[in-house]
Amino acid sequence: MKAIFNRRVVVDSSSRLTKLLANPTTHSHLNRQTFTSLYKPNQSRHFRTHYLPSSPSSPPVSRFDPSQLWRSEKIRGFFASALGNKAVKLGNLVESRVGFIGSQFPKKGFEFQRFSGFQRRGWKHWLQGLSDRDVVLGLVIANAGVFVMWRVFNQQFMMNNFMISLDNFKSGRLHTLITSAFSHIDIGHIVSNMIGLYFFGTSIARNFGPQFLLKLYLAGALGGSVFYLIHHAYMAATSPKGQGAFVRDPSRTPGLGASGAVNAIMLLDIFLHPRATLYLEFFIPVPAMLLGIFLIGKDILRITEGNSNISGSAHLGGAAVAAIAWARIRKGRFRF
């Protein structure tokens, strides 16, 4: 308010002096023309239009009277000082208004700082903010989402992007090494895998953190896919050719499911707690060590028989990842 009052005093005084000294019409226009030419043209017009009192315009003066030079210099100096004071006070007024508005409306920089901080720290910082159950439920929801996609999206699109096979791998669809571990078609398949993921995954996340669990899941998925491809490449190279239309080509046989990833999580928990009691088929109590031996032996048998719809090679890939993770933990390297 003080800045506004001062500006009004300066403007009123300058306007009154202009009227007193500008009785002759020629002098009034002469002074106004001299002031405009010596000060910056754009700024003088701007301030004069918005802050100086308006007066009727007259025809421009084309001649200069030398007798009014001294008087013009004094008036010009007065107006220049008045304009300078007014410009300073105008700046103070703008700053005070900006400060007032800023105090009434606080800065909304939290979201930007939060986003920039997320960019700087990346996924690692984001994962550290998640709880153990958050990661487990997130993996379950991701698997359930792909399960729904099988019933909504085009089947060929799903086979090309959510199933692992030698054809997909040779075609450059390397993302299927991971996406196939989130893919299920049969309801019984996804239910059994998600139950194992929930119970054993919660135990692993509680002991080593959610970031470790996510890395273990992805490593198990990758290990299961690699073992699956190696096994089917071997079968494609050794299988007889031209045995009829009903012989499956191993290079074109696709696979899917989270079994490799879940097997890595489950077997790591078994390796860490071999004397714990687990329940086979949900109601048969057996020592964890015996259950682990039984599961690995059954997968080896599936590979040797070669006619099972369950991929023993993918399960063994998960078991290999679990063994590597267990060895690193034994050496004190908790970061997988």
From Swiss-Prot:
It is a multi-pass membrane protein. It is found in: Mitochondrion membrane. One of its GO terms (biological process) is proteolysis. Its main location: mitochondrion. The keyword Oxidoreductase does not apply. It is an enzyme of class 3 (hydrolase). InterPro entries: Peptidase_S54_rhomboid_dom, Rhomboid-like_sf, Rhomboid_protease_S54. One of its GO terms (cellular component) is mitochondrion. Pfam families: Rhomboid. Belongs to the peptidase S54 family. PANTHER family: PRESENILIN-ASSOCIATED RHOMBOID-LIKE PROTEIN, MITOCHONDRIAL (PTHR43731:SF14), RHOMBOID PROTEASE (PTHR43731). The functional differences between RBL12 and the yeast Pcp1 appear to be at least caused by differences in their transmembrane domains. This is RHOMBOID-like protein 12, mitochondrial.
